[in-house]
Amino acid sequence: MKVDPNKEKALAAVLSQIEKQFGKGSIMKLGEDRSMDVETISTGSLSLDVALGAGGLPMGRIVEIYGPESSGKTTLTLEVIAAAQREGKTCAFIDAEHALDPIYAKKLGVDIDNLLCSQPDTGEQALEICDALTRSGAVDVIIVDSVAALTPKAEIEGEIGDSHMGLAARMMSQAMRKLAGNLKQSNTLLIFINQIRMKIGVMFGNPETTTGGNALKFYASVRLDIRRTGAIKEGDEVVGNETRVKVVKNKVAAPFKQAEFQILYGQGINRTGELVDLGVAHKLIEKAGAWYSYKGDKIGQGRANAGKYLTENPAIAAEIDKTLRELLLSNPSAMSSSSSDDENSEGNVDFETGEVF
């Protein structure tokens, strides 16, 4: 296609002027001087990494994780921190709920000695700390736990019973406008944990909503809905949760996929159990009766023993993990557990926020 040389000269002149005024990189062609692949951090769950499409949570973006109480929201974010720290990244945890347990975090593999932690007094303080950490360019992952606990200063200084309609939503809206651009420039991943509330008077559709207004729903590149679907028992003792995560919004890959995995109390995500299940499903691990074998060698009788073998032999576990990632990320449809959620297809979906109505 022939381009008018006068237009080319005019474009070159204006681009030069913009770069001189606002700095190099302030405007560029989409495919120029940058990797088209999105840098990601693992969630700690292979099936969830595959459901996300890109292999994990995207850097330089805002992510929202929401769900009912005790569904595994904080555990999932601590797994992300542990994965980031293993890659040498710097992480910060804004504990607005004042409920972070350092002993539990350490059990999940978090290096608590190098984890930055803040327990802010007000919502504005929490978001200002986020903004300062982001602009520094020195922090790679920031977790905010949770949006519901980000209380505006006016509400804290007021009396119980005072009306403060829309204060939190206005605060979050302003923060999103400030943070979004800075996060992209510093390539920082910002994860907001959120709680669920019920809309009053909803007769049809989903009555659930999240706190903090609508701004976060629009600015988030990824929104994850995490739910506890059952209990894991050893005899009569409950030792963990069966967990399902739905990707209700995804701007970096196809949305509406889901992943199922186990969260064990005091241990976090059951990675080796996932490897055994996915390995068998994709014929990397052979199953004959109750026995599991890998490359002709028996690795255990029963799923628990096979998982224990992989825990004791991390090199073999890493080899299986690498092979599965290459297989599933190149062909995500091969994984049945991360198929599109049938429930979402039954209702109307807001493609901007991922909400079903």
Curated annotation (Swiss-Prot):
Entry keyword Metal-binding: no
Segment forming the signal sequence: none
Under the heading Pfam families, the entry gives: RecA (PF00154), RecA_C (PF21096)
Kindly report the protein's main subcellular placement as a broad class.
Answer: cytoplasm
Cite the InterPro entries for this sequence: AAA+_ATPase (IPR003593), DNA_recomb/repair_RecA (IPR013765), DNA_recomb/repair_RecA_CS (IPR020584), P-loop_NTPase (IPR027417), RecA-like_C (IPR049261), RecA-like_N (IPR049428), RecA_ATP-bd (IPR020588), RecA_C_sf (IPR023400)
Q: Which residues form a coiled coil?
A: none
Looking up SUPFAM superfamilies in the UniProt record yields: P-loop containing nucleoside triphosphate hydrolases, RecA protein, C-terminal domain
Q: Tell me which domain of life the UniProt entry assigns to the organism this sequence originates from.
A: Bacteria
Q: Which residues bind ATP?
A: G67, P68, E69, S70, S71, G72, K73, T74
Note the Gene3D superfamilies from the entry.
P-loop containing nucleotide triphosphate hydrolases
Q: Does the keyword Oxidoreductase apply?
A: no
The record's family statement is: Belongs to the RecA family.
Q: What is this protein's record name?
A: Protein RecA
